[in-house]
Amino acid sequence: PHMVNAMNCLASAFCILFLFWTITHLARRILTRQGAELTKANIVAVLGTGAVGALAYTFTDTFWFSAIEGEVYALSSMFTALVVWLMLKWEEQADQPHSMRWIVLIAYLMGLSIGVHILNLLTVPALVFIYYFRKTQRITFKGIAVSTLISGAILVFINSIIIPHTVYIGALFDLFFVNSLGLPVNSGLVFFVVALLGALGMGVYFTHKKGRTVLNLVLLSTLMILIGYSSYASVTIRAAANPPMNSNNPSNPFALYSLLNRDQYGDKPLLYGPQFSAPTSGYKYKDVRYLDDDGKYKTVSIISGYEHPDEFMHLFPRMWNYAASKESYKSWSAYRTRTDYERDENGEIVRDAQGRPNKIEVLDFGRRTLWDDGSGYEPLVIVEPTFRENLNYFFTYQLNHMYWRYFLWNFVGRQSDIQPTDAIITDGNWLSGIKWIDELYLGPQDNLPDEIANNKGRNTYYFLPFLLGLIGLIYQLNRDPRNFSIVMWLFVMMGIALVVYFNTSPNEPRERDYVYAGSFYAFCIWIGLGVLAVCDLIVWATRRKGLMAPIAATVVCMVVPGILAAQNWDDHDRSHRTMAR
């Protein structure tokens, strides 16, 4: 445990270092033309932007928690920061000989990061646009569209082809080697890996000889991704040793393929699929292979999911999880109430002593559809969420509660560290510390119980980090729109795009803010660049240039990381926290 914690802290420290270098690079791009000399005042301003932005991210709630947690997200954050900085290094040296070595290194790190977390792949669109902006002088809609398609193709190639299907093809080789040739398990996989790497190596050699630069870079990058991805071999080696903890036992290629394909988590619809109340019309089956006692692969067919009637398949199904309670979905969607007569179990209207019918408020939720299941009985009444209710759930729960709430935790303030089980005003909301704003949606903030008022997770930043980041965002948009779009790609892909992809259900077992750390990392770039805007404001107000303005701007903006550190210290300090206490 101590080594894991130490590694996470060290990885987090390097993440902050690479963030500092990234912010200073982007600040230099704003202050000077490429290749121009920096003045002393500019150097101080650049260092100030890096210090403020990097320290702000250091003390944000989400990153600080991940840095001291024995999980993969600290190392994942380091890989994210590293590949972005390396791509900016390439952009700086793109005209020099052998500058493509930076892209080759990025490809290797991408492959290596797959063994940590696939979240790092979401940096690909930003990296592609860095390449596009560096290689073209005139930005066009066609160029932007092509770059977007290329980045999507790279994501699909790595996530849907390299990660699962290289192992699957190797598993098919292993099936032939074991069942037909009588060779040991994994021998076919080893043969396939050697053959694949050899073929790619030959391709790299011949494309280099013939001067096919682009194809050579593609093949070399693919080779580097696979070499980095080979770190997953340790999973199979460890599983083959049969340790006490051996989840899914990926000791052969087919078991490893199932693990990489995330079969243990089941399927969830993304853009098209059923709602939680959709009836089933049958089972989905798939063939799986396992090793029998004779060391041969056997094939069995297992149930992998449910099939649903076509009329119950819809676009953008956000309320999809049949295991989640219907009431949980209702509380987060646009359900309404209407007045109706109270009825008993026989459907008769209930009346009072004077014979007047009782009226009650009932939920008005969903769309009612009659479905004949072919059993010969009366059609079933299926209550489906409407598209409007789906969108309301998406904006209210998935976007607001599961992303923007976390965003505001980090840059506005946090009410408590108690996870809310519903949309209640006493637990887990954002809190600014500005009384009249907080009372607009949380009610009176006076005379609060001790468990709320003295909760260590109650941190208030008075909107200061948020405002400085917003200033930096607008400043970069006006002064350097190309690099602004790159940071925005990071912010959106590591944030809102993940919200759409994860399609979360109500009542998650834990808070999921750590997933969006990359998005908060991007916003801290804007916090750092906000120092330049404050510096320009001081120069405009005093009519004086020189060292005074950048020094004053840095000192003033240091309030942001200062308040983050001061407010978050008590709930993130791990001193004397042991298993026995």
Model-found features: residue ranges?
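Membrane-interface transmembrane helices that cradle and orient dolichyl/undecaprenyl
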Residues: 27, 40-44, 83-102, 129-139
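Signature aromatic-anchored transmembrane alpha helix within multi-pass, membrane-resident enzymes
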Residues: 153, 222-226, 477, 481, ...
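Loop-to-helix entry region of an early transmembrane alpha helix in multi-pass inner-membrane enzymes
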Residues: 2-17, 21, 35, 39, ...
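Hydrophobic/aromatic-rich transmembrane helices and adjacent perimembrane loops
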Residues: 490, 496, 508-533
